[in-house]
């Protein structure tokens, strides 16, 4: 391994207004590492793909390291030469702040290993592994983990988890960060270290909810669980027209205190332009035998759906079908707020506001999602084990603005903020304490909303310790002072 001083000495002359990336990095990384400037014929093959066209970073080049040693050298050289960079995997992160980022893309796609250890009951995944990469190996092993499963198969495992890690199996297994037992992480000095309960435990605390701010995680190890229901699930999709909206919202409020752990529910508000009507879709994922699903089916049927589809599937089939966010080319921004209670009247206001917006802007394709997972197991984990603060959230609202014309950005941003304020006002949480799940953040909420006022002093201290120059975590930055 080459040492930092050697790298600095040899590349110091490369500092200039225009940096030749091949000259800067090429001599110090393995031959398999790919380097491309913007405009090179192979740039699109080296840079990480992005899901959304909204506020993307401006890349000055891209590099795809082959080994951890390559990645260490890249970080050392970039920091020494004031080359801004951002490590990427699935390319699904969005934030208002990303549009201000200019720098080098470090594509982690080559770190896509998935290693199951039945003896220790853990699985280790590389930085480039996608959720689709882990589903079948876990299924064949009869195991499961809660690492934000419920996201699409093209989403990066680690990125989707280190902000909290919610998904359809949250009721059964709790948060993804609570199953995170160890990481290998490259810090701002280029050092590769381990963080677990016995080594750098404070850093592990910070990674469990704010991991993107402290380095590049090359591998993460998670505790596994026995697969629920022998790897099978019952899934039901029920679609309702606008006349049923309030009844559907009232049904959702019934689940506030009686949601069983094996049940995951997502309600979405969207618009069907073939019939020019706002529709509600209730997706139910039931990780238990068919017989125990019947009550939920009967409730959904009693609300009068215009269509329904119910089937038995394997977990592999279930998660392979969640491929919506794998489609690229549109402008997509996201925003969120956590809810401690379901207020049907407020949800009806959201429905009405979105209907008016759909009718005013024919090019708008967005949707609002309300995600319900039992939080009993989430609450069982002591709060002091992770910086993730919002364990009392009962329902996660995720609003996705989707449009093809960039001129719609301003009105869609206003819609998102307006809906967020309405929902927070009746969320059951204090007015000055919005519960923002950082993985869904719009980008304007601020660190107190992402990690809580109580956690910020310790979190800022650790940021100063591990990343004093703020080279990591550009999308949701931690204040250092």
UniProtKB/Swiss-Prot annotation:
One of its GO terms (molecular function) is FAD binding. It is an enzyme of class 1 (oxidoreductase). Transmembrane segments: none annotated. Asperfuranone provides anti-proliferative activity in human non-small cell lung cancer cells. GO terms for biological process: asperfuranone biosynthetic process. Residues 1-16 form the signal peptide. Its EC number is 1.-.-.-. Its cofactor is FAD. The keyword Signal applies. InterPro entries: BBE, FAD-bd_PCMH, FAD-bd_PCMH-like_sf, FAD-bd_PCMH_sub2, FAD-linked_Oxidoreductase, Oxid_FAD_bind_N. Residues 52-227 form the FAD-binding PCMH-type domain. The modification Pros-8alpha-FAD histidine is found at residue 92. One of its GO terms (cellular component) is extracellular region. Glycans are attached at residues 82, 196, 241, 276, 309, 312, 376. Keywords: FAD, Flavoprotein, Glycoprotein, Oxidoreductase, Signal. The keyword Oxidoreductase applies. Induction: Expression is regulated by the asperfuranone cluster transcription factor afoA. Disruption phenotype: Completely abolishes the production of asperfuranone. It comes from the Eukaryota. FAD-linked oxidoreductase; part of the gene cluster that mediates the biosynthesis of asperfuranone, a probable antitumor agent. The polyketide synthase afoG is responsible for producing the 3,5-dimethyloctadienone moiety from acetyl-CoA, three malonyl-CoA, and two S-adenosyl methionines (SAM). The 3,5-dimethyloctadienone moiety is then loaded onto the SAT domain of afoE and extended with four malonyl-CoA and one SAM, which leads to the formation of 2,4-dihydroxy-6-(5,7-dimethyl-2-oxo-trans-3-trans-5-nonadienyl)-3-methylbenzaldehyde (compound 2) after reductive release and aldol condensation. Belongs to the oxygen-dependent FAD-linked oxidoreductase family. This is FAD-linked oxidoreductase afoF. It comes from Emericella nidulans (strain FGSC A4 / ATCC 38163 / CBS 112.46 / NRRL 194 / M139) (Aspergillus nidulans).
């Amino acid at each position: 391994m080459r040492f930092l001083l050697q790298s600095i000495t040899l590349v110091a002359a490369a500092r200039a207004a225009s940096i030749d990336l091949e000259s800067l990095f090429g001599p110090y990384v393995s031959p398999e590492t790919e380097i491309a400037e913007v405009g090179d014929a192979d740039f699109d093959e080296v840079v990480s793909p992005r899901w959304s066209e909204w506020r993307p970073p401006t890349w000055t080049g891209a590099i795809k390291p082959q080994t951890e040693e390559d990645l260490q050298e890249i970080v050392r050289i970039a920091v020494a030469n004031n080359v801004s960079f951002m490590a990427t995997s699935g390319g699904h992160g969005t934030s208002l702040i990303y549009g201000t980022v200019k720098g080098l893309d470090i594509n982690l796609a080559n770190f896509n290993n998935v290693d199951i250890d039945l003896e220790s009951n853990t699985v280790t995944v590389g930085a480039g592994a996608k959720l689709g990469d882990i589903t079948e190996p876990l299924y064949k092993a009869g195991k499961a983990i809660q690492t934000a499963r419920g996201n699409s198969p093209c989403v990066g495992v680690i990125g989707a988890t280190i902000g909290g890690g919610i998904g359809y199996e949250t009721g059964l297994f709790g948060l993804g960060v609570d199953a995170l037992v160890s990481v290998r992480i490259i810090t701002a000095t280029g050092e590769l270290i381990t963080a677990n309960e016995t080594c750098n435990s404070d850093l592990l605390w910070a990674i469990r909810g704010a991991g993107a701010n402290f380095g590049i995680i090359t591998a993460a190890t998670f505790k596994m669980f026995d697969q629920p229901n022998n790897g099978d699930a019952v899934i039901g999709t029920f679609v309702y027209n606008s006349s049923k909206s309030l009844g559907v919202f009232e049904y959702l409020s019934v689940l506030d205190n009686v949601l069983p752990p094996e049940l995951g529910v997502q309600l979405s508000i969207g618009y069907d332009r073939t019939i020019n009507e706002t529709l509600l879709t209730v997706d139910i994922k039931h990780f238990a035998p068919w017989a125990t699903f019947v009550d939920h089916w009967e409730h959904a049927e009693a609300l009068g759906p215009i269509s329904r589809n119910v089937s038995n599937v394997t977990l592999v089939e279930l998660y392979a079908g969640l491929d919506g966010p794998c489609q690229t080319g549109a402008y997509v921004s996201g925003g969120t707020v956590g809810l401690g209670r379901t207020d049907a009247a407020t949800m009806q206001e959201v429905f009405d506001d979105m209907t008016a917006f759909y009718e005013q802007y024919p090019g708008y394709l967005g949707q609002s999602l309300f995600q319900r997972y039992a939080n009993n197991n989430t609450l069982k984990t002591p709060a002091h084990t992770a910086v993730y603060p919002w364990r009392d959230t009962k329902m996660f609202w995720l609003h996705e603005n989707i449009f093809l014309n960039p001129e719609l950005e301003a009105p869609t941003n206003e819609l998102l903020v307006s809906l967020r304020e309405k929902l927070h006002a009746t969320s059951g949480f204090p007015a000055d304490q919005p519960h923002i799940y950082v993985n869904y953040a719009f980008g304007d909420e601020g660190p107190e909303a992402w990690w809580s006022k109580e956690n910020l002093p310790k979190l800022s201290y650790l940021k100063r310790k591990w990343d004093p120059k703020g080279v990591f975590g550009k999308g949701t930055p931690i204040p250092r002072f």
